[in-house]
Amino acid sequence: MPLFDVYPLYNVTPVSGKGIHVYDDKGVEYLDLYGGHAVISIGHAHPNYVQAIKNQLDHLGFYSNAIQNPLQKQLADKIEALSGCKDYELFLCNSGAEANENALKLASFKTGKKRVIAFNNGFHGRTSAAVAATDNKNIIAPINAQQAVAILPLNDIEGVKTELEKGDVCAVIVEFIQGVGGLDQGSAEFFEAIDKLCKANNTMFIADEVQSGYGRSGKFFAFQHYNVTPDIIPIAKGMGNGFPIGGILIHPDIESKYGMLGTTFGGNHLACAAGLAVLNTIESEHLMDNVNVMSDYFIGMAKTIPQIKNIKGRGLMLGLEFDFEVGQLRKDLIYNHHMFTGGAANKKLLRILPPLNIEKTHIDQFFEALKKALSANN
């Protein structure tokens, strides 16, 4: 049976990984500066992570949410301890799209309203309301377009105010660092205005931390760089280091009721074991401190490359913007220099999302290869 052909693929077949490297079926080593869309947070095959999953598999891999699973509470407590998000409650699911879907559903339950505000170049997933709130018409089917969404420019405080005053908006959803859209960030004034306007208009403020969370910004959550208190915080990608897991942190003002949210696989024993291993490693290896040190070093190196016209993002969620489309450059880096990087909706942007335990030597290797690739492409 052929696979449904929806992914344009590079001709590389990774079969193993260790740390910041992956190895293909021919034994070639690649430096992974992309982590499969910011999923690999603590490095490929980290021994703590591998051992935790193996140990759990020896006991119980899965049972449904019809029984007690103490691992879920352990994971919730660890997220609270590392993030500093006190008094929030955790609902576990399986992916970022599912996290955002449940966040929007919960906002509608809480407010009794159904319209959503999202922003230009935002990406929130490929399902139902989440994809309707995504600024990409190519992936929105007619069935998704039934969801009422106002998509506004980033930093448009007056636009947000005008839409909220109509009285029918259940949620404002925003990425504090845009991922697929191209690493743009709103201003502090903008984010803080959203927070105040939502509170004044019975609207839920959703901070989409699916890609920017789990230490990638240099703080546990990207919204923590600002003076805001989101109502709902969707999380996923770096949460399981490759094991499918997602969730939403829910402000205590939102009351839970039996059956309002649910999932078969969400919060299963293996997923929780993976999630705990990631958090324990972020803590024990001081990876958020490393993010800040490596980010400063990376940005300093990037500033020495004249072809780089703009450096976007923060922490280890970075974008290098050129004055030409980077598709060929990415191919050169993969096939000739054996390095994985990412693209974005902005075709002139190279996206950098490495594991959080990257070292200076890896960054040096990247910039040496980038200089050679840029020279070859001139």
Q: Which residues fall in each region the model found?
A:
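Conserved N-terminal phosphate-binding loop of PLP-dependent enzymes in the Aspartate aminotransferase
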Residues: M1-N378
